[in-house]
């Protein structure tokens, strides 16, 4: 086992859907660095996928979490308080948009989809952070996942880009609020990665090809790339870093254009 950047730390990992999830890659590396973990799953269907993954790396705590239901959130943190007392880091890894409205024009987004997308993808970070703050007795680190579509228009991203933009603004305000308790809040802006969530994005294979061709490192981002960045942000190595968008996209975001 890799020793210690997170030795003795406890962390809550949300957003695992299967073994291709970015949250799963982050969890694996956090465990290798000594962390004790608590997983969540969104529904009974995902429970069947998440529990075997938890068992695979010796994660003894797995709970249901539906961020659209306040009682589900309070039940989770009551359990954490009872079992752990306190904990050290939180990964906010969930996002949602109606895949049917990721096609076509953003202007045609329905009110229901806009509300659900912003609630699950952004407001849930506030709710989880508020609950986590009360249990991060010795300070802590909160990390969420974002994407370049928050800053620039990406085809077939639509309302999710707006939700990620709101998420990125939120981390700055949360970082300001929670800094007095030595809790850091940051986001990782990862390049496009093939996951269950990304399968809802139209023409995703073209996005991957374009990213690899444009990025200075001439490849696509991997789950492991993001996992390493997350471990850094969870650990004491980043104790002076908060309110930041940390790019893990092989340099794609620095490019103004491709070679002519």
Swiss-Prot record:
Positions of the catalytic residues: 147, 157
Pathway connected to this protein: Lipid metabolism; fatty acid biosynthesis
Matching CDD domains: ENR_SDR
EC number: 1.3.1.9
Binding positions (NAD(+)): 15, 21-22, 42, 66-67, 94, 164, 193-197
Catalytic activity reported: a 2,3-saturated acyl-[ACP] + NAD(+) = a (2E)-enoyl-[ACP] + NADH + H(+)
Oligomeric form and interacting partners: Homotetramer.
Protein name stated in the entry: Enoyl-[acyl-carrier-protein] reductase [NADH] FabI
Name of the gene encoding the protein in the UniProt record: fabI
């Amino acid at each position: 086992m890799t020793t210690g950047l997170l030795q003795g730390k406890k962390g809550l990992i949300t957003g695992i859907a299967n073994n291709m999830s970015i949250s799963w890659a982050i969890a694996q590396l956090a465990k290798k660095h000594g962390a004790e973990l608590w997983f969540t799953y969104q529904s009974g269907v995902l429970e069947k996928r998440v529990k075997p993954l938890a068992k695979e790396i010796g994660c003894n705590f797995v709970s249901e979490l539906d961020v659209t239901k306040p009682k589900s959130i309070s039940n989770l943190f009551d359990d954490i308080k009872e079992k752990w007392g306190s904990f050290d880091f939180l990964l906010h890894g969930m996002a949602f948009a109606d895949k049917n409205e990721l096609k076509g024009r953003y202007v045609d987004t329905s009110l229901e989809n806009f509300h659900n997308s912003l609630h699950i993808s952004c407001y849930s970070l506030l709710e989880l952070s508020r609950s986590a703050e009360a249990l991060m007795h010795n300070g802590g680190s909160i990390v969420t996942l974002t994407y370049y579509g928050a800053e620039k228009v990406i085809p077939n991203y639509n309302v999710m880009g707006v939700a990620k933009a709101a998420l990125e603004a939120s981390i700055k305000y949360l970082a300001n609020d929670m800094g007095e308790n030595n809790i850091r809040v940051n986001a990782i802006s990862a390049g496009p990665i093939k996951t269950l969530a990304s399968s809802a994005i139209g023409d995703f294979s073209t996005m991957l090809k374009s990213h690899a061709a444009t990025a200075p490192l001439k490849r696509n981002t991997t789950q492991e790339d993001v996992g390493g960045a997350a471990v850094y942000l969870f650990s004491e190595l980043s104790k002076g870093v908060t309110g930041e968008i940390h790019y893990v996209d092989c340099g794609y975001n620095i490019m103004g254009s491709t070679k002519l």
